[in-house]
Amino acid sequence: PQTVSIVTDDDIRRQGFRQIGDIIRYTPGVNTSQGEGHRDAVVFRGVRSTADFFQDGIRDDVQYYRSLYNVEQVEILRGPNALLFGRGGTGGIINRVTKKAVVGETFTVNDFGVDSFGASDVAIDTNFVTGPNSAMRINVHSDDLANHRDFYDGSRLGINPVVTLVVSPETTVNLSYEYADHERFIDRGIPTINGRPDESLSDIVFGDPDINVTTLEATIFRGMVSHKLSETSKANLSVTSSSFEKLYQNLYASGYDGTLVTMDGYLDPTERDNFI
């Protein structure tokens, strides 16, 4: 059986969601996990996945924390999905539908958030008319990360201009460019003993602020042509070209016997060019 939950932009703004994990916590049938401190990792019906993510129906499986500043809605599907997306999944998928320019309208929406740890978030969403049958929409996002743990900090920057052209009453063209620049400290948490975290170590960070770092720089070009076939059907042609450069390196507690903590670490660079 399949079930779908849809979280809209209004829901995201009203609840103050800032990342995929925030949405997952409010969605039945799925859970979120740590993702080693550098990526979205969702558990669909008991099976963890870092790959079953889509953007406008196109696979988006590079491992990073996805921002919500340019999202119109998030679709969470639990159940079989190979016929819908051309590949099998672990038990579900998450599809982000991005914001498109609105022809004939001019508006600007500003969001600002801050928490008690000093983290802050700023987002601007502006749409303006460029012609009788065209419009441009620009979304910009920047945040500074902080929490209760020592050394934890980071920043994220996102820019996404979109142009919409209404070619005819039946045909619409959307062209999008997205740039992302992320950096953050990696905190893998504290050791466990007998299946539970050792709370006596809760104030200790097992890592090095000069080593436990992840960075991401990405550019994504998207083009989509939508043609209305009838009152109940339409045809879509989507093309995505993207480039990702990501670095993930960390030290973490790999073993603990109650008195001695064993440390380990690794370096994981990713360079990915996609054309879909």
Where do the language-model regions lie?
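Soluble non-cytosolic domains of exported or imported proteins
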Residues: 6, 14-18, 117, 154, ...
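A short, compositionally biased micro-patch
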Residues: 25, 37, 47, 77, ...
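Residue-level marker for the onset of beta-strands and adjacent loop->beta junctions
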Residues: 38-40, 49, 122, 147, ...
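Acidic/polar loop-and-plug regions of large Gram-negative outer-membrane beta-barrel proteins
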Residues: 143, 147, 159-228, 234, ...
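Membrane-spanning beta-strands of outer-membrane beta-barrel proteins
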Residues: 37, 89, 119, 154-156, ...
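Outer-membrane beta-barrel translocator/receptor signature
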Residues: 69-72, 83-161, 167-171
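Acidic, small-polar-rich N-terminal luminal/periplasmic segments of exported/outer-membrane proteins
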Residues: 1-105
